[in-house]
A protein has these predicted regions:
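Bacterial N-terminal signal peptides
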Residues: 10-20
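Structural motif
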Residues: 43-47, 96-98, 141, 180-183, ...
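Beta-rich, blade/repeat-based domains predominating
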Residues: 27, 68-83, 115-131, 156-171, ...
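Conserved beta-strand positions in repeat-built beta-propeller and related beta-rich domains
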Residues: 29-40, 89-93, 134-138, 168-169, ...
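Blade-level signature of beta-propeller repeat domains, shared across WD40, Kelch, NHL, RCC1
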Residues: 321-355
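Short loop/turn segments immediately following beta-strands, especially the blade-tip
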Residues: 49-57, 100-106, 144-150, 183-192, ...
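Aromatic- and glycine-enriched pocket-lining scaffold segments that form the walls
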Residues: 133-189, 195-204
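A short beta-strand motif characteristic of beta-propeller blades
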Residues: 60-71, 108-116, 151-157, 193-203, ...
Length: 355
């Protein structure tokens, strides 16, 4: 009987927490949007979904916006980002970034930002303050945003395998699928200052670095094909590896990373078809559990208010690219909220919230 009462109390608490999340979201009259891209090698489109939390939650297609550029990237994350009113999407095949703008309850493509001369194939973008950061096949660069002008030195890259760029307080990081992480220092105004250093990775955490995210000035990243498939790096380039879900690659490979509330991190585990959850402090952490998905995740994000998680995945039933949204409760646990219907796109690239 006591166990029954505990179960009922827990269920009531879970419902109350989920209801509170929905109520907080409903306070935003303009709504919550989830953006991704088709990544088409001929004509890239931004795909805009709206999350409706009234009654039975839904994730409905609102618009498909031609970027005016071409996609075609693979093995990357962070192709789409969104801040307060402006966002960006990488056009890998046309050496450009499209600027997005939100006005009330609508999102549109506002223009094209060209890469610095000689820089090609942008794979990942990041937004921090009034800066846009871009990494491609041969350059990492920062631009004033939303104006788009190159701001600060362009960093030449000799390794064309960049997967993602992420930005902290005093430094940015680029993960390289070839097996390295590059530190890019920032100046006092938050732009790249041209100084770079390679992070020395331990042998148990150096195979195929992919997803990356910052917690203040601490980098978290996924060396996806390593036994230690999650790791932290501080500004002094000290590395703190964390054992991932077992068995390791090829059964499990946390690939794509998002920072959650508190000490939580969420990772898209592609072969495991799951979201793998980690806890950490600043010098280590632990794998907690995995939440199953009906397909292979290809990128993941958490909303700025830390109440929602969105993951893009390629459905196991062959229906193509899908977006799933989860509510994050007060303890960091995930509750499924809504999933998009198939729209005829084989796989999505990049995912971001606009609130």
């Amino acid at each position: 009987m006591k166990a029954n009462l505990c179960y009922r109390a827990g269920a009531v608490l879970a419902v109350m927490l989920l209801t509170a999340v929905f109520a907080a979201a409903a306070d935003n009259g303009d709504g919550i949007f989830v953006l991704t891209s088709t990544n088409s090698a001929s004509n890239n489109d931004v795909v805009v979904f709206k999350l409706n939390t009234a009654g039975t939650p839904t994730l409905s297609l609102v618009n498909m916006l031609p970027t005016g550029g071409a996609g075609g990237a693979s093995g990357n994350a962070g192709a789409v980002q969104f801040g307060d009113d402006f966002g960006a999407v990488a056009n890998f095949g046309s050496n450009s970034v499209s600027q997005l703008v939100r006005q009330g309850g609508s999102i549109s493509v506002a223009g094209t930002i060209k890469l610095a001369p000689g820089c090609v194939k942008p794979a990942s973008v990041a937004l921090a303050g009034n800066q846009l950061f871009v990494v491609g096949a041969n350059c990492a660069e920062s631009h004033k945003f939303p104006s788009g002008n190159v701001d600060g030195p362009v960093v030449a890259l000799t390794d064309p395998s960049a997967a993602q760029i992420a930005v902290g307080q005093s430094w940015a990081a680029v993960t390289m699928t070839s097996g390295s992480v590059l530190q890019l220092l920032l100046n006092g105004e938050g732009t790249l200052n041209g100084t770079t250093a390679k992070v020395t990775l331990p042998s148990a955490a150096n195979n195929t670095p992919l997803g990356a995210a910052f917690w203040g000035d601490i980098l978290g990243f996924n060396p996806a094909h390593s036994p230690d498939s999650f790791a932290l790096v501080n500004k002094n380039r000290n590395v703190f590896p964390v054992v991932g879900p077992q068995p390791p690659y090829p059964t499990n490979a946390p690939c794509w990373l998002a920072k959650g509330p508190g000490s939580l991190w969420y990772s898209g585990n592609s072969p495991g078809q799951a979201i793998s959850i980690f806890f950490s402090d600043g010098q280590g952490g632990t794998f907690y559990k995995s939440v199953s998905l009906p397909g292979t995740p290809t990128d993941i994000t958490v909303s700025r208010d830390r109440q929602w998680l969105a993951v893009i995945y390629t459905a196991a039933d062959g229906s193509g690219g899908r977006v799933a949204v989860f509510a994050i409760d007060a303890y960091g646990d995930l509750s499924p909220v809504a999933t998009s219907s198939p729209i005829g796109v084989a796989a999505f690239s990049g995912v971001a919230f606009s609130q």
